[in-house]
């Protein structure tokens, strides 16, 4: 990370006020090159005196520095009044909708925001005597298949066109690799990404899986992904957001993707 990036990250890390956090969180969600989303962001943040500076600072960050900062600022936003948190969620919905097409990563950002800001709660966790994933009930395996199929739109690669809702060939291969351990027990469903309701239902089922089994699932996702080469930023962000939603630590291969940016600068 060069001095310009370090300075921008340090400035953004000083933000604490509701309006500043509001603007920075939204800026971190902007899709690269989207003029519609940028106009929507400017409309949402027009009252902030230093709006241009916030956008410039965010623009100076590397892609793999954005999600860790997003998580930090969102945690601070949780300490703001309920009206401020609700205003951020409403603004997020408008900015995300400005393009007319919602990216898969946008859906994960949205779910993570609702959970971190206290708008939704994880499902109650079941107990388990082992971390072995082969012992999971059929309902959990079905949820793994559904959620993994959703991730396959981003991991290990994305489709070139946002309109294409099907996973890439690499995504299909990754899905098959993740689901292979259960193939001996039952037929594995095809890689069919769920809609938003199905995604939320699958996530809630996974959140109820025992705490010692969730890290094993996350490791399976990451280990299958790195077989295709170094993680790209979208794939890494999708997996990191999933770790957060499942309250699971980052596997080393995933932590490495972010380790040379945010943590060292703010240590």
Protein language model regions, located:
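Small-residue-enriched hydrophobic alpha-helices in membranes
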Residues: 1-97, 101-267
């Amino acid at each position: 990370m060069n001095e310009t990036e370090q300075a921008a990250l340090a400035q953004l890390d000083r933000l604490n006020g509701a309006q500043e956090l509001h603007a920075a969180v939204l800026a971190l969600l902007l899709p690269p090159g989207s003029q519609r989303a940028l106009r929507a962001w400017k409309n949402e943040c027009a009252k902030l005196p230093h709006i241009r500076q916030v956008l410039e600072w965010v623009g100076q960050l590397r892609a793999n520095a954005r999600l860790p900062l997003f998580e930090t600022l969102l945690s601070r936003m949780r300490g703001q009044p309920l009206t401020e948190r609700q205003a951020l969620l409403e603004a997020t919905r408008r900015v995300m909708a400005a393009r007319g097409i919602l990216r898969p990563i946008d859906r994960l950002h949205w779910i993570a925001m609702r959970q971190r800001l206290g708008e939704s709660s994880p499902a109650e966790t079941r107990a388990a005597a082992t971390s072995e994933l082969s012992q999971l009930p059929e309902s959990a395996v079905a949820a793994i298949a559904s959620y993994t199929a959703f991730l396959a739109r981003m991991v290990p690669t994305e489709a070139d066109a946002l309109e294409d809702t099907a996973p890439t060939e690499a995504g299909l291969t990754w899905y098959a690799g993740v689901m292979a351990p259960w193939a001996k027990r039952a037929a594995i469903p095809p890689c069919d990404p769920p809609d938003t309701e199905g995604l939320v239902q699958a996530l809630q089922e996974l959140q109820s899986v025992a705490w010692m089994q969730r890290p094993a699932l996350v490791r399976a996702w990451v280990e299958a992904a790195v077989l295709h080469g170094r993680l790209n930023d979208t794939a890494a962000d999708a997996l990191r957001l999933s770790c957060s939603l499942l309250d699971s630590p980052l596997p080393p291969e995933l932590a490495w993707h972010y380790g040379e940016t945010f943590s060292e600068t703010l240590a």
